[in-house]
Amino acid sequence: SLQSVTIPNSVTSIGDYAFEQCYSLQSVTIPNSITSIGDGVFNVCKSLQSITIPNSVTKIGGGAFRRCESLQSVTIPNSVTKIGNRAFWECTQLDEPSRLRLKELNYTEN
């Protein structure tokens, strides 16, 4: 089962539902070549614990991290200008700094 992913520098976007339901996925390395994270990319990746989104990313798709129940920490740079609906829906373990950052970006669960 897939536990770790390093996306190569030649990739510029992560397509919709690319890693959906990879239940054992614990870590993902996203390079600075990525500009967008599609819809549902990490949907129901129940073992993913933290994610750092690089400064190159401007868009996080709807439901991108939906139901990532172990996700505790997310680092979102100022370059992100759009976060889709329910991108972090049911991420019940998110720490306070991550929640404050999402609030700062005017992200709401709708």
Predicted features by range, described:
Residues S1-S13, Y23-S36, K46-K59, E69-K82, ...:
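Structural signature of tandem-repeat unit edges
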